[in-house]
Amino acid sequence: MYKMRNDALVTRVRNTPLAKEPTLDDVLKHIPGMKQTADGSLEVNGLGAPTIYLNDKKATSAELSHLDVKLIDEIELITTPGAKYDATTGAVLRILTRRTDEGIFGKMQVYDQLSEVNTNHEELTLGWVTKNISLTGFYGYTDNRYNVHQPQEALVRAKDGEYLFGTDRHGKNKANYNATELNFDWLLSKQHEVGIQWEGLWLNGGRSEKQQQYYRYPNPTGEDTNSEMKLSDADGEMKYFDAESQQWGHQRSHHFNLFHLAKWSKHLSSQIYLDYARNKDSDSQPITEKEGSEMQETLNRSNSNYDIYSGRIEVKQLFSDKHSINYGGEWSLMEGKGKTESSADMLGTTEYKNHDTKTAAYLQYQGEAGRWSWWAGIRYEHLTSRYTNLSEESPDNMERHYDQWFPSFGITLKEPSWHHSLSFRTTTARPSFSQLSGNIYYTSRFQYQISNPKLQPVNTYRLTYSVQWKDFMGMLRYTRIDHSIMYIHEVPEDKPVRYVSTFMNFNKMQKYMAYLNWGHVFDCWRPNAHASITYQRFSVNDHGELISYNGATWNASFDNYFTLPNDYQLSLSYSFDNGGQVGKTKFSPTQNWSLGANKSWMDGRLQVAFSANDLFHQQLFKERTHEHAVDFSQTEDYKLWSYKLTITWKFNKRKGRYNGMNSAEDELNRL
């Protein structure tokens, strides 16, 4: 099911056990190199969340949520994207689907997922396809619920001694999603195609949280009774209080997309995409803290409105069957305004406006000769970000300009039994407005979060070597990160709180990664095993104390598919992650056992699938960070264990097409 193509890992879905998975998320879990994060989302090992393309167009979350897995041919995991991709993109998942059939089609899918609480989802897709016209519509409703347990503890070293602050959080989360999508695609001729797409999202959600907080002031005798950060009230100095909060949010968004695809000649083609999106959200968070007969109430509220305009053009010119160039550009404008309010001391009210414009251009050349193929590209991006604080009490305006060039290249050698690829890419990660604004955010009476307007962009340089031999695939990667942005905890002398968290740029970090994958087909059994290890070199001079964060992380997984008679299929997977050192944080090991079973009837029109994740409840993410002033630890337990039943019914088993690209997705994700 897996092979190398140039510098990409290709996963074959059609006519494999993956084609019987009920949803795209179930497929992505089995792609080598993908891993689950603390909140249950998926990311590429060492590269973060991938940007997903559907038939060369940037996909939206709504499109992916109702994508019919059986129509997927293959999925490419590109760890060194070319120059046409945004400079903030770490990895790309490129999903290729089959061509559409003509006729009326439909699909209904429901699932129920049981953990400590239930999540359910219902969706309906209908469409009509002719030789030249495709019209499809989608509606989905999700009632998403999950519980969170998040204990935290901080040992704070201040001038007058050591303080201990702790919180034991229990949260209940609920969100109701109503998502709609309409697509119209018109093939004007063999050379020209146009289309329009509209997406709408209505989200209402909330989080209720109960906390037991505790604190201990410095021991008057100067003795360190809690040097290992373990709770103990033997000395009678530990004090406790309770806190409750309710956070409710509302989001409304609309997104329109227009496209034109043209083939001007045998050697010249173009693609044009235009987008408009509007996003409006608001939330409120009342917090009540009780200690004995004393009670403190805090109310936090915020709202924002954003408009996004964007356009993109891509041109491909063939010089011959073996040589071509791609070039193009994009432009986007994001305008928004918002307001944050808090009744807590030091915070008050902040009104602001954001104005963000981006212009980019790229050029890439592809060629091949015999067993060799290569590509080289250059991308230029200019970004202007303007933040205006409208509050008269504390004006904090700023304007940032970014001008950067991003080179990339790749070279591949194909031999009868071997496949070699060497590639290089540069990327950037620019600080967000929330990190730059200078605002102060309330966490608890002992902790605030402060933004940092002096943050600089993070620049990353990656050199990757990939190889395939028969059933084995391997990868070596060197990564250098300049000015990485991380949290830091400090003890300010000029503010009446005991510690604050903020963002800061750090010096050079280096990572060395090695990866190996093996897969084979034994009749009805398809096993696949992979392992990877990453060693990090990183140290910080923290107020005169040189702290080393060097260390290794490694993980391994073993997937098994069993194809049985009468269209039954079983799967069993195991994964282990040692946690290790990631940035300044050290994680404890986690492991996961999962299984699945599905059965189809009526030539695939009816499918029932069952899956179980984290069978032994071992997906607990324990973290520890040591700094000069603060030792911080927490456990993130998102209750990832679950049992899920999915039922899918299809009418005529056809799928409508929409070939437009969403040029505004990057800006939407930032929101």
Annotate each predicted stretch with a short phrase.
Residues M4, K35-T80:
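Periplasmic plug
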Residues K353-D356, N397-Y402, T428-D482, V500-Y512, ...:
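Outer-membrane beta-barrel signature, preferentially recognizing the C-terminal barrel domain
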Residues L96-M108, Y177-T180, S208-Q212, L274, ...:
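Surface-exposed extracellular loop regions of Gram-negative outer-membrane beta-barrel proteins
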Residues V110-E116, T130, Y141-R145, G200-N204, ...:
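Transmembrane beta-strands of outer-membrane beta-barrel pores
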Residues I308-R312, K358-A360, I450-N452, Q456, ...:
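Outer membrane beta-barrel strand-and-loop segments of large Gram-negative receptors
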Residues M1, L24-V27, E43, A62, ...:
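N-terminal periplasmic accessory domains that precede
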Residues V117-R145, G161-E209, Q251-W264, W554, ...:
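Transmembrane beta-barrel wall of Gram-negative outer-membrane proteins
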Residues A179-N204, E244-L390, K414, W418-H419, ...:
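Face-selective signature of the C-terminal outer-membrane beta-barrel domain
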